[in-house]
């Protein structure tokens, strides 16, 4: 399987996606379901396909994805990052174009931890003057 497939790992928030691509007809399988079945929202589906449309490869590759952790938005971002890395593994000449679009860079924003004595990461208890 590894011989004909190109691989990329994508991460976003607490989601991790393992992406395998090979030449094909444009089918995208995420955790055993089509991308439309797995991601209900159209925006999440578009996010997953952005690197393919940018490089004019929307119908050129079959993609198999295993993704876990996080929610729908984070998983879609992880899939996009993984697809980008797999495309670069397939053809390094695509890297400048994908990099200019900002798809190569890992979005490092994570949830800030809750602090002791506070309601959340920054929300404090209501102050009473009297």
Swiss-Prot record:
Keyword terms, alphabetized: Ribonucleoprotein, Ribosomal protein
Cross-referenced SUPFAM superfamilies: Ribosomal protein S5 domain 2-like (SSF54211)
A Pfam family that the UniProt record links to this protein: Ribosomal_S9
GO biological process terms held by the UniProt record: translation
Disulfide bond entries: none
InterPro entries: Ribosomal_Su5_D2-typ_SF (IPR020568), Ribosomal_uS9 (IPR000754), Ribosomal_uS9_bac/plastid (IPR023035), Ribosomal_uS9_CS (IPR020574), Ribsml_uS5_D2-typ_fold_subgr (IPR014721)
Protein family: Belongs to the universal ribosomal protein uS9 family.
Protein name, as recorded: Small ribosomal subunit protein uS9
Organism listed in the record: Leptothrix cholodnii (strain ATCC 51168 / LMG 8142 / SP-6) (Leptothrix discophora (strain SP-6))
């Amino acid at each position: 399987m590894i011989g004909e497939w190109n691989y990329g790992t994508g991460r976003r928030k607490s989601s991790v996606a393992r992406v395998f691509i090979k030449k094909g007809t444009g089918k995208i399988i995420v955790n055993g379901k089509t991308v439309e079945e797995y991601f209900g929202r159209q925006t999440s589906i578009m996010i997953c396909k952005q690197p393919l449309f940018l490089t004019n490869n929307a119908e050129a590759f079959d993609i198999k994805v295993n993704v876990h952790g996080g929610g729908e938005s984070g998983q879609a971002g992880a899939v996009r990052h993984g697809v980008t890395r797999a495309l670069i593994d397939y053809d390094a000449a695509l890297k400048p174009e994908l990099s200019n679009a900002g798809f190569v860079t890992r979005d490092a924003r994570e949830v800030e931890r809750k602090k002791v004595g506070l309601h959340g990461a920054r929300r404090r208890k209501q102050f009473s003057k009297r």
